Amino acid sequence: MMSVGIDCGAKTTKVVVVKDGRIIGKAKVLSGFDQKKSIIEAWDLALKNAKISADDVNRICGTGSGKNVVKFALPNTRDLANDIKAMAKGASFYFPKARTVADVGAEEGRAAKLDEKGNAVDFAVNEKCAAGAGAFIEAMGRALETPLEQMGPLALQSDKEIPMNAQCAIFAESEVVGLIHRMTEKQDISKAIHDAMASRIVSMIHGSESTRTW
């Protein structure tokens, strides 16, 4: 059985090729303005990495904020899964004993509680502010003149505790600017930013209350 999963997110599009429960190929590209083009680009690259052709694929499933575009780009797509279900099944695939999973996407953060079969039985989504999403880290990185990819490793160089109280990404950026003006080390600011996001995610996990069904 050859299956392909496509996650068309706000920032990146990811494709994974699975054969009999084993990942044999994958690819990731920037989503860009033309999501259809990004999906096809990631699809072609993943199939190339897996050393298979489109005719070898038995099943295609799409998820992510652009999941409806997946079916438009690849008409043979059979299934569309919402983000919570895909997150739960993905976490369970890698960590069968996991009962709590958090996913920080570019535009929103999500948390879910899983049962022993990897089904999400409770969940919460932060959709109101970028302060709980990857865009928050990216925006703070711009204030620090540091690329997103370097923010995590930079934070790991610090062991200081600097509280950030702002619950809004705009006000948080003002806090970061204030820390810069006080000559705070860049790695300490980066750690404070990550700690603030982690705190929001933990609060979301503890306060998860299912408000939607799928």
Please tell me what each predicted stretch does.
Residues S3-D7, R59-G62, R99-A102:
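Short glycine-aspartate micro-motif
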Residues K67-G105, R110-D122, V202, H206-E209:
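Conserved phosphate-binding catalytic cores of ATP/NTP-utilizing and phosphoryl-transfer enzymes
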Residues W43-N58, I201-R212:
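Phosphate/pyrophosphate-binding loops at sites that engage ATP/ADP/AMP, CoA/4′-phosphopantetheine
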Residues G32-Q35, K117-K160:
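Glycine-rich phosphate-binding loop plus the immediately following alpha-helix
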Residues M151-I189:
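A mobile "lid/hinge" subdomain adjacent to the ATP/sugar-phosphate binding pocket shared
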Residues S174-S210:
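Adenine-nucleotide phosphate-binding core of ATP-dependent small-molecule kinases
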Residues G64-G66, T211-W214:
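Glycine-rich phosphate-binding loops at beta-strand->alpha-helix junctions
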